[in-house]
């Protein structure tokens, strides 16, 4: 769950103190009617939720190809991530690989709030010569 404390902590960490995130009185005057989480907080949370799903050893994030913020995330929202593998490519004599992912972040109402595509370098499950 995204909490008010998460949003405040992210504002401190990132330096993004936009009042839409941290000032309830200001946020009440916006079309959202209340504070919303930073888009990058949602992206970071999605990354954390995805790290072991599916289980593999991630070496590095290589590229974030796209991110779309589809709907606001409010404090109190419960998020989950739907992950789809779009492409796999062997690298490093088969010891590593690049995986292209699509990740959809969905709230408790099954509404997609964020979507994106990224590439990670992962350790191969088996060396290429055994496949």
What are these regions (language model features)?
Residues 1, 68, 119-121:
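Generic structural detector for well-ordered beta-strands
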Residues 1-37, 124:
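Catalytic strand-loop segment that frames the active site of acyl-thioester-processing enzymes
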Residues 6, 16-18, 58-65, 79, ...:
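A generic structural signal for short beta-strands and their flanking turns/coil linkers
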Residues 28-37, 41-87:
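Hydrophobic beta-strand-centered segment that forms part of the acyl-chain substrate-binding groove
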